[in-house]
Amino acid sequence: MRDDDDLVPPKWRPLFNNQDWLLHDIVVKSFYGFGVIAAIAHLLVYLWKPWLP
């Protein structure tokens, strides 16, 4: 194992280096952020005009 992968958890070190791990972190957090924004938007639209009886 490489010693320069200090940000990567030990079980993921064979797959990721630090740069890959940081990019993965950005992608995952962006996906979660999008999901939260989408859920809030759906809730607001449902409160405005319910689409289920």
Curated annotation (Swiss-Prot):
Q: Which Pfam families match?
A: LHC (PF00556)
Q: How does it sit in the membrane?
A: Single-pass type II membrane protein
Q: Which residues lie on this side of the membrane: Periplasmic?
A: 49-53
Q: Which domain of life is it from?
A: Bacteria
Q: What GO biological process, any one, is recorded here?
A: photosynthesis, light reaction
Subunit structure as annotated in this protein's UniProt entry: The core complex is formed by different alpha and beta chains, binding bacteriochlorophyll molecules, and arranged most probably in tetrameric structures disposed around the reaction center. The non-pigmented gamma chains may constitute additional components.
* Residue ranges annotated as Cytoplasmic topological domain: 1-25
Q: Please list the GO terms describing molecular function.
A: bacteriochlorophyll binding; electron transporter, transferring electrons within the cyclic electron transport pathway of photosynthesis activity; metal ion binding
Cellular location of this protein? Cell membrane
- The UniProt annotation places a bacteriochlorophyll binding at H24, H42
Tell me yes or no: is Repeat among this UniProt entry's keywords.
Answer: no
UniProt xrefs under Gene3D superfamilies: 1.20.5.250
Q: What is its main location?
A: membrane
- Keywords (A to Z) from UniProt: Antenna complex, Bacteriochlorophyll, Cell membrane, Chlorophyll, Chromophore, Formylation, Light-harvesting polypeptide, Magnesium, Membrane, Metal-binding, Transmembrane, Transmembrane helix
Checking PROSITE patterns in the record gives: ANTENNA_COMP_BETA
Q: Which family does it belong to?
A: Belongs to the antenna complex beta subunit family.
Name positions with the PTM N-formylmethionine.
M1
What name does this protein carry?
Light-harvesting protein B-808/866 beta chain
Q: Does the keyword Transmembrane helix apply?
A: yes
Q: Which InterPro entries match?
A: Antenna_a/b (IPR000066), Antenna_beta_CS (IPR023623), Antenna_beta_dom_sf (IPR023624), LHB-1/5 (IPR002362), Light-harvesting_complex (IPR035889)
Instruction: Describe the task this protein carries out.
Output: Antenna complexes are light-harvesting systems, which transfer the excitation energy to the reaction centers.
The terms describing its cellular component in GO are:
plasma membrane; plasma membrane light-harvesting complex
